[in-house]
Amino acid sequence: MIPLTHGLILAAILFVLGLTGLVIRRNLLFMLIGLEIMINASALAFVVAGSYWGQPDGQVMYILAISLAAAEASIGLALLLQLHRRRQNLNIDSVSELRG
């Protein structure tokens, strides 16, 4: 069995990597990938904590987090496809300009 500290450290490293990708990247697709990494890191923390205390709640939360991440990814990718068709660019700077 993996110790609690090792699992939580791995989850924290993954969360920081996802946050770094979210903050540094200017492409919306890479920002979405960074957000998915952050969601998976938090789900990993739930699983590690649940297995440490012998409770199935962590696995239930993991299933919930994965289903929410799948819904978020599908909606995000659909919006990105529409944005790419209209602007031919996924740069966050070009998207932030409003018409009107």
UniProtKB/Swiss-Prot annotation:
The chain crosses the membrane at residues 4-24, 28-48, 60-80. The keyword Isomerase does not apply. It catalyses: a quinone + NADH + 5 H(+)(in) = a quinol + NAD(+) + 4 H(+)(out). GO terms for biological process: ATP synthesis coupled electron transport. Belongs to the complex I subunit 4L family. It is found in: Cell inner membrane. InterPro entries: NADH_UbQ_OxRdtase_chain4L/K, NUOK/Mnh_C1-like. It comes from Enterobacter sp. (strain 638). Disulfide bonds: none annotated. Its EC number is 7.1.1.-. One of its GO terms (cellular component) is NADH dehydrogenase complex. The gene is nuoK. GO terms for molecular function: NADH:ubiquinone reductase (non-electrogenic) activity; quinone binding. This is NADH-quinone oxidoreductase subunit K. It is a multi-pass membrane protein. It holds the Pfam family Oxidored_q2. PANTHER family: NADH-UBIQUINONE OXIDOREDUCTASE CHAIN 4L (PTHR11434:SF16), NADH-UBIQUINONE OXIDOREDUCTASE SUBUNIT ND4L (PTHR11434).
